[in-house]
Swiss-Prot record, chain A:
Reversible hydration of carbon dioxide. The modification S-nitrosocysteine is found at C201. The keyword Lyase applies. This is Beta carbonic anhydrase 3. The gene is BCA3. The modification Phosphoserine is found at S95. It is found in: Cytoplasm, Cytosol. GO terms for biological process: carbon utilization. The modification Phosphothreonine is found at T35. The keyword Signal applies. GO terms for cellular component: cytosol. Keywords: Coiled coil, Cytoplasm, Lyase, Phosphoprotein, S-nitrosylation, Signal, Zinc. Strongly expressed in aerial tissues including leaves, stems, flowers and siliques, and, to a lower extent, in roots.
Curated annotation (Swiss-Prot), chain B:
This is Beta carbonic anhydrase 5, chloroplastic. Reversible hydration of carbon dioxide. InterPro entries: Beta_CA_cladeB, Carbonic_anhydrase, Carbonic_anhydrase_CS, Carbonic_anhydrase_sf. It comes from Arabidopsis thaliana. Residues 1-56 form a transit peptide.
Length: 258, 301
């Protein structure tokens, strides 16, 4: 990327045109096009801000002001029943797909909706996002939602083994959390197309995350006591479908063998 | 009133026929009969009442119905949740997806969001609801207290999302949204010993400790709640400053193809304050290490 300032660039152009005046018309057309594009860029930015302003005012008039009891209560405290892990993908907002109203769901969103295993330093981010709703807010349900055409899962499936890290250092470091899912799919589904493998991996990665949830002691103890339910889901926005399943984890009473 | 007060109290209930049907069904098919197979869809709020009534009808004293609340989730409740999810999804499909099918079809091929939003996971501050983002508008990261770790260290969760949205999706705007009564910021402000690694929450929110230090420097004489509010806003600016520490983000901001914005949603009085990072003015400040300069500040109410 050039670090030349626009003043230097204009100066250079001026010098060129003074030497080759027949380029004048071409230059004029290109400069006009560039100016139009820059104007549009600027107005796009204004549009972006106007967009969220009108979104907020719409929310305030049609939702907030029409439900004063709800919002007064939420201002004091929240009692969500759900903790949801969803992908940061712009197409899969859980509030849209599952119509969660404000106050219903504590929602964590990251690349490929992953839950890493317990690690106090490396994964304090997700750990905190689990610890707070579970131990402080006492949510009753955890839902991990995978989705179709997930860029994170596709990236995971595309990583060649034993190659040097690429320039997407953070992404690769993060998505390898679900490497067990990729390994399984590469083995069990090796005859499928890459696209079908990815779809299977999207669901298998959810299962890896569900398993990882149990590595957190405060999750496991509540699941065993039946105070917390863990579910996985897959939202397919190509077909318009939503699959939902549950993690069944319990210990049966011991019986003496002797 | 007759010997079965339960039934009479139900009949005063506007949804009584529904609940009554449920009880009768229960009696015929036994207590393990799943609600799923009844023809009538019973709203969640009344399922809870129905459960209470079932306990009452079994001959126990009304006082014991208190025990029915807060009891461990049982299999029947699980079926309720599945049913609930199903209704929610089908409503979305009918009211939004099918109505705008062309748009969803295009989105299925690729997303081209204009925004990367970094917001708190708090159930009260969903950016789609509060700012009206539609599917395809905003790549959204949500973590505790909407914090951004520094480029050089810290967990990779948020950083991977930055990398993807900025370098692959080429978003034009990053919006960091903080909010009132943030539990994460409160935990940060209450933390006594920063080395305290007993909990995940502490290990994570310490990422925002510079915001706490700057708050204590200027606002330590205020009431704790006001200090927290100050820190909520300071933390947003601190995160914006951190974003400029990512070389590929700074490069794009410098070129003008990426703008950084801060937003503060106050759900107590329902206002939204928004501001934009003034990169040119910030560059001078950055050398002094004293934060960022902002412009275009406005409050929507």
């Amino acid at each position: 990327m050039s670090t030349e300032s626009y003043e230097d660039a204009i100066k250079r152009l001026g010098e060129l045109l003074s030497k080759k005046s027949d380029l004048g018309n071409v230059a004029a057309a290109k400069i006009k096009k560039l100016t139009d594009e820059l104007e549009e860029l600027d107005s796009n930015k204004l549009d972006a801000v106007e967009r969220i302003k009108s979104g907020f005012l719409h929310f305030k008039t049609n939702n907030y002001e029409k439900n004063p009891t709800l919002y007064n209560s939420l201002a004091k405290s929240q009692t969500p029943k759900f903790l949801v892990f969803a992908c940061a993908d712009s197409r899969v907002s859980p509030s849209h797909i599952l119509n969660f109203q404000l106050g219903e769901a504590f929602i964590v969103r990251n690349i490929a909706n992953m839950v890493p295993p317990y690690d106090k330093t490396k994964h304090s981010n997700v750990g905190a996002a689990l610890e707070y709703p579970i131990t402080v807010l006492n949510v009753e349900n955890i839902l991990v939602i995978g989705h179709s055409c997930c860029g994170g899962i596709k990236g995971l499936m595309a990583i060649e083994d034993n190659t040097a890290p690429t320039k997407t250092e953070f992404i690769e470091n993060w998505i390898q959390i679900c490497a067990p899912a990729k390994n399984r799919i590469k083995q069990d589904c090796k005859d499928l197309s890459f696209e079908d493998q990815c779809t299977n991996c999207e669901k298998e990665a959810v299962n890896v995350s569900l398993g990882n949830l149990l590595s957190y002691p405060f999750v496991r103890e509540r699941v065993v006591k039946n105070k917390l339910a863990i579910r996985g889901a897959h939202y397919d926005f190509v077909k318009g479908t939503f699959d939902l399943w549950e993690l069944d984890f319990k210990t049966t009473p011991a019986f003496a063998l002797s | 009133m007759a010997a079965t007060p339960t039934h009479f109290s139900v009949s005063h209930d506007p949804f009584s026929s529904t609940s009554l049907l449920n009880l009768q069904t229960q009696a015929i098919f036994g207590p393990n009969h799943s609600l799923k197979t009844t023809q009538l869809r019973i709203p969640a709020s009344f399922r809870r009442k129905a459960t209470n009534l079932q306990v009452m009808a079994s001959g126990k004293t009304p006082g014991l119905t208190q025990e029915a609340n807060g009891v461990a989730i049982d299999r029947q409740n699980n079926t309720d949740v599945f049913d609930d999810m199903k209704q929610r999804f089908l409503a979305f499909k009918k009211l939004k997806y099918m109505d705008d099918f062309e748009h969803y079809k295009n989105l299925a091929d690729a997303q081209a969001p204009k925004f990367l939003v970094i917001a708190c996971a708090d159930s009260r501050v969903c950016p789609s609801a509060v700012l009206g983002f539609q599917p395809g508008d905003a790549f959204t990261v949500r973590n505790i207290a909407n914090l951004v770790p520094p480029y050089e260290s810290g967990p990779t969760e948020t950083k991977a999302a930055l990398e993807f949205s900025v370098n692959t999706l080429n978003v034009e705007n990053i919006l960091v949204i903080g909010h009132s009564r943030c539990g994460g910021i409160q935990a940060l402000m209450k933390m006594e010993d920063e080395g305290d690694s007993r909990s995940f929450i502490h290990n994570w929110v310490v990422v925002g400790k510079k915001a706490k230090e700057s708050t204590k420097a200027v606002a330590s004489n205020l009431h704790f709640d006001h200090q927290c509010q100050h820190c909520e806003k300071a933390s947003i600016n601190h995160s914006l400053e951190r974003l400029l520490g990512y070389p590929w983000i700074e490069e794009k901001v410098r070129q003008g193809s990426l703008s950084l914005h801060g937003g503060y949603y106050n759900f107590v009085d329902c206002t939204f304050e928004k501001w934009t990072v003034d990169y040119a003015a910030s560059r001078g400040k950055k050398k002094e290490g004293s934060g960022i300069a902002v412009k275009d500040r406005s409050v929507w109410s």
